[in-house]
Amino acid sequence: MQAAYRSTPPCVLVFSGSDPSGGAGMQADIPAITALGAHSLSVPTALTVQDNVSVFAVHALDPELVRHQAQVLIDRFDIAAV
């Protein structure tokens, strides 16, 4: 059995919050997915006010905005994983 060859990396749809310190959330998901050989498609769900020790605030994004962004990506890309 031969391994399948992909000319483009598989797309992973990620729903996550934004961590401005880079230790978690979308900012950490993107390089982890890239390191595994996939392409990250990010849908932010929340904005946080935090540093590398404490979370001071979490602001959830409007669910309709999250849904709309996800649908745009689903319509355009072949999603391999969520």
Regions found by a protein language model. Name each.
Residues M1-A81:
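Small-residue (G/A/S/T)-rich helix-start motifs and N-terminal tracts that mark the onset
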